[in-house]
């Protein structure tokens, strides 16, 4: 019997919804990355995008352990000389909590074209409501 290899045209992708309230950032992100890759399906194939769509609500209420709120910094560069900027995790959660989960999950996905396709399937909202009710997302236990 031959090994089953999933083809792109027969891959079925479902929508799942997760509540980030009181979830630990790293453990929560690994679960999301695994579902985006498609590892929770029996038809997982590494080179095909078989992952599901993921909706995250309540990103503002995610839990950070230890002293990371004060000691963890995110850096970016404007492109100008002396243009390095840094922001603490505490300020990032206050200003743009969606970006914290986005960066955490993106770091756990493949670093190529397949990873760029997978990260587009992650939809993050800071509040309770989202605009994907039409897709009828299923709630998975985490």
Swiss-Prot record:
<keyword id="KW-0687">Ribonucleoprotein</keyword>
<dbReference type="GO" id="GO:0017148">
    <property type="term" value="P:negative regulation of translation"/>
</dbReference>
<keyword id="KW-0689">Ribosomal protein</keyword>
<comment type="function">
    <text>This protein is one of the early assembly proteins of the 50S ribosomal subunit, although it is not seen to bind rRNA by itself. It is important during the early stages of 50S assembly.</text>
</comment>
<dbReference type="Pfam" id="PF00572">
    <property type="entry name" value="Ribosomal_L13"/>
</dbReference>
<dbReference type="GO" id="GO:0003729">
    <property type="term" value="F:mRNA binding"/>
</dbReference>
<comment type="subunit">
    <text>Part of the 50S ribosomal subunit.</text>
</comment>
<dbReference type="GO" id="GO:0022625">
    <property type="term" value="C:cytosolic large ribosomal subunit"/>
</dbReference>
<dbReference type="GO" id="GO:0006412">
    <property type="term" value="P:translation"/>
</dbReference>
<dbReference type="InterPro" id="IPR023563">
    <property type="entry name" value="Ribosomal_uL13_CS"/>
</dbReference>
<dbReference type="GO" id="GO:0003735">
    <property type="term" value="F:structural constituent of ribosome"/>
</dbReference>
<dbReference type="InterPro" id="IPR005822">
    <property type="entry name" value="Ribosomal_uL13"/>
</dbReference>
<comment type="similarity">
    <text>Belongs to the universal ribosomal protein uL13 family.</text>
</comment>
<dbReference type="InterPro" id="IPR036899">
    <property type="entry name" value="Ribosomal_uL13_sf"/>
</dbReference>
<dbReference type="InterPro" id="IPR005823">
    <property type="entry name" value="Ribosomal_uL13_bac-type"/>
</dbReference>
<protein>
    <recommendedName>
        <fullName>Large ribosomal subunit protein uL13</fullName>
    </recommendedName>
</protein>
């Amino acid at each position: 019997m031959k090994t089953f290899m999933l083809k792109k045209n027969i891959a079925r992708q479902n929508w799942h919804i997760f509540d980030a309230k009181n979830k630990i950032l790293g453990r929560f992100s690994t679960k999301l990355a695994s579902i985006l890759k498609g590892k929770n399906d029996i038809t997982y194939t590494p080179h095909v995008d078989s992952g599901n769509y993921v909706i995250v609500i309540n990103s503002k209420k995610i839990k950070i352990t230890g002293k990371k709120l004060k000691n963890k910094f995110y850096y970016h560069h404007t492109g100008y000389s002396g243009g390095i900027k840094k922001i603490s995790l505490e300020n990032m959660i206050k200003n743009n909590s969606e970006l914290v989960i986005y960066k955490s999950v993106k770091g756990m996905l493949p670093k190529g074209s397949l990873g760029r396709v997978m990260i587009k399937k992650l939809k993050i909202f800071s509040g309770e409501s989202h605009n994907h009710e039409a897709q009828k997302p299923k709630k998975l236990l985490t």
